[in-house]
């Protein structure tokens, strides 16, 4: 029993409020999901949210609205930590790219830089077969 109480105390102690004014929002927009992580300048995560974690399942996870809800959730937690200015780094071709940035902007967080960091191969590995829809 002492072990369970100890881990609960450790979890409660981790939720320390940090006063960080500037941060980086990493938006990973894939075709299936959108993941938003807000970090400080050193890369330590302050908050994160996913479309699937907001209650969207299946094909609804990949919608712009799901990305917007996830970005609002992560942004609110980051604002509680003191975030006022963000750099946004977008990775991936998914449909939630723009709506996540708009949602962060609508929260009142000042967006300083929007940067696309999508990895582009210089003719590396052979890609998977073409999709037929």
From Swiss-Prot:
Keywords per UniProt: Ribonucleoprotein, Ribosomal protein, RNA-binding, rRNA-binding
Covalent S-S links between cysteines: none
One Pfam family here: Ribosomal_S11
Example of a GO biological process term: translation
Gene3D superfamilies: Ribosomal protein S11
GO molecular function: rRNA binding; structural constituent of ribosome
Keyword RNA-binding: yes
GO CC entries: ribonucleoprotein complex; ribosome
InterPro entries in UniProt: Ribosomal_uS11, Ribosomal_uS11_bac-type, Ribosomal_uS11_CS, Ribosomal_uS11_sf
Subunit structure: Part of the 30S ribosomal subunit. Interacts with proteins S7 and S18. Binds to IF-3.
The family this protein is said to belong to: Belongs to the universal ribosomal protein uS11 family.
Biological function: Located on the platform of the 30S subunit, it bridges several disparate RNA helices of the 16S rRNA. Forms part of the Shine-Dalgarno cleft in the 70S ribosome.
Name under which the protein is recorded: Small ribosomal subunit protein uS11
Organism whose genome encodes this protein: Ralstonia nicotianae (strain ATCC BAA-1114 / GMI1000)
Upper classification of the organism: Bacteria, Pseudomonadati, Pseudomonadota, Betaproteobacteria, Burkholderiales
């Amino acid at each position: 029993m002492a072990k369970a109480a100890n881990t609960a105390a450790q979890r409660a102690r981790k939720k320390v409020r940090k006063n960080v004014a500037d941060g980086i929002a990493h938006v990973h927009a894939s075709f299936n999901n959108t993941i938003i992580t807000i970090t400080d300048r050193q890369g330590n995560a302050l908050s994160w949210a996913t479309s699937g974690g907001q209650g969207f399942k299946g094909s609804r996870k990949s919608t712009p609205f799901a990305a917007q809800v996830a970005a609002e959730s992560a942004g609110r937690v980051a604002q509680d930590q003191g975030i006022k200015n963000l750099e946004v780094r977008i990775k991936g071709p998914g449909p939630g790219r723009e709506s996540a940035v708009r949602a962060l902007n609508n929260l009142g967080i000042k967006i300083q830089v929007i940067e696309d960091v999508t990895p582009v191969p210089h003719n590396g590995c052979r890609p998977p077969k073409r999709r037929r829809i």
